[in-house]
Regions:
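Loop/helix patches that line or flank the sugar-binding groove of alpha-linked glycan CAZymes
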Residues: 10-11, 243, 255, 260-263, ...
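Active-site groove signature of glycoside hydrolases
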Residues: 199-222, 318-325
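Beta-strand-rich binding/interaction modules
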Residues: 479-497
Length: 517
């Protein structure tokens, strides 16, 4: 489904994820805004990122930080206006960059007009827009529900929080005894699908380059193997190919063998699902810790399986993090982060850098939940731009800030690191440039793991592109390692940490070395 129609710009895309409310505040209300993003596009471009993933910016009651949408076609006033967002599109494109919006197709806010109409007892256009049972006494099995708040007799399924009613895309295997379980081709589910296409059409026509799709694998119910949801996305892919063939699609699915067949260009390996992503950075003994007690072996095995199943189709992406994960710096120090970024920025697929990870922003401990963040709130604190008032994020009083800043006196900031060639940000910038300068390291370059990083050992992989071959040696553990797999006579292109290479390669602990051979 994704071959010659893949947008060419994905071949060398490096994404920067922006959580808008925490990025840059230009009107002193303590909340980041679209004009603040426009103001900082130069910073993103100077880092080397050429694409943006913008988290939800649509009208919302913000019970889940914007992942509870009240109006898909209106920008939330706290961020600005639709015109501001279109201006952001223009400014991004003027720099030769691209931008994806965050699309939440599985549920809405309870304040959405669709849900208000759906709650009415009298049948109407939106009666079947959500998954409702036929009786308030019957709960949708395996899903939470909303009930007792409507004139309508029934319980409405929810997807995540209890205020996020599930939109009705149908059931792949409806239970004949439960008439409320509508098949995918019933009138209600098809109308929901068309409404989703209308939303996509609206923003693509306005200048968006595509979408990152929230919970993309969860739309069709009673769909254990995902085949119904795959078919739904194939239909949407066909619509995009007809009307917006350049639109890029990335899924939050975590199973590339399904999402890429479904028509997405990219999927993530994430903190949920079968990827073992957490083994690398976010567990009791992460592989990228210098303690050397972690292992990348199960991650490598899962990655190999995904590669085999997708057979070269689409891109498999490994993000530095996102708004739902602990910050990388919660488990890794600066030197460990350097080696982690050397891995992240030399793997196939498009890299995604979560705002602030490039400077080693920390998880802020002990925060009270903000807008449904709960344990995720500490990863959503304001971007630290400089050493000025509120770290340069906002001129508002500290108590007005959306989320409190990292209170540490030594918190990292972008300005200081941009002036320091030895900083983490400078390393990340060099690594992005290294990636872009070498065809073998591009998103679609060839990939073969030579070792699997078992038991804290070095991870070795070979990247190929055109006539170029690069061997990557990633050795996070604090002990040296001999790497017999690297051919003699090669040329070291980039290194973090020490090494000797006189016919055989030996790397120091906490190192990353890249050899062209």
């Amino acid at each position: 489904m994704t071959s010659h129609k893949d947008p060419a710009w994905l071949d060398n895309a490096v994404f920067y994820e922006i959580y808008p409310q925490s990025f840059n505040d230009t009107n002193a209300d303590g909340i980041g805004d679209i004009n603040g993003i426009i103001e900082k596009l130069g910073y993103i471009q100077e880092l080397g990122c050429n694409a943006i993933w913008l988290n939800p910016c649509f009208k919302s009651p913000f019970g889940d930080a914007g992942y509870d949408v009240e109006d898909y076609c209106t920008v939330a006033p706290r961020y600005g206006t639709n015109e501001d967002l279109v201006e952001l599109f223009r400014e991004v494109h003027a720099r030769g960059m691209h931008i994806l919006l965050d699309l939440v197709p599985g549920h809405t806010a309870v304040t959405h007009k669709w849900f208000k109409e759906s709650m009415k007892a009298a049948r109407n256009e939106f009666t079947d827009r959500y998954v409702w049972t036929d009786s308030i006494w019957e709960e949708p099995q395996g899903m939470g529900c909303i009930r007792g708040i409507s004139d309508r007799d029934g319980s409405c399924a929810v997807n995540f929080f209890s205020h996020q009613p599930a939109l009705n895309y149908g059931f792949y295997k409806p239970d004949p005894a439960k008439k409320w379980q509508q098949p995918m081709d019933a009138e209600g589910p098809l109308a929901t699908r068309e409404a989703l296409k209308d939303i996509m059409r609206f923003w693509l026509s306005a200048g968006a380059d595509g979408f990152r799709v929230d919970m993309a694998g969860s739309l069709v119910k009673n769909d254990e193997d995902g085949q119904g949801t795959v078919a739904l996305w194939q239909d949407i892919r066909a619509f995009l190919d007809r009307e917006f063939p350049a639109a890029a699609m990335v899924s939050e699915w975590g199973e590339p063998d399904k999402s890429l067949i479904g028509g997405f260009h990219m999927d993530f390996l994430l903190h949920f699902g079968p990827s073992h992503y957490n083994d690398l950075f976010r567990c009791a003994q992460p592989y990228f810790s210098r303690r050397g007690k972690g292992s990348a072996a199960e991650f490598v095995a899962a990655y190999r399986r995904s590669m085999a199943k997708t057979d070269g189709r689409g891109l498999i992406c490994i993000p530095s993090g996102n708004h739902d994960m602990d910050r990388l710096a919660r488990n890794l120090d600066t030197d460990e982060l350097r080696v982690a970024f050397a891995f992240l920025l030399t793997m196939p697929g498009a890299p995604f850098i979560y705002y602030g990870d490039e400077i080693g922003m920390r998880y802020v401990e002990g925060l009270t939940s903000v807008e449904g963040g709960y344990g995720r709130t500490g990863s959503r604190s304001p971007m630290q731009w400089d050493k000025g008032l509120n770290a340069g994020f906002s001129s508002a009083s500290a108590e007005k800030l959306y989320i409190p800043l990292d209170p540490a006196a030594d918190r990292p900031d972008a300005c200081a690191q941009m002036c320091d060639e030895g900083s983490l940000r400078s390393e990340v910038k060099r690594l992005i440039a290294f990636r872009q300068d070498n065809p073998a390291l591009q998103s679609r370059g060839g990939m073969e793991f030579i070792t699997d990083g078992a038991d804290g050992g070095a991870l070795v992989y070979r990247r190929t592109g055109g006539s170029q071959t690069i061997y990557a040696v990633i050795n996070p553990a604090g002990t040296p390692a001999q790497i017999p797999q690297i051919p003699a006579g090669g040329r070291v292109l980039y290194s973090i940490g020490g090494y000797t290479y006189d016919g055989a390669l030996t790397v120091e602990g906490g190192s990353a070395v890249f050899v062209e051979a």
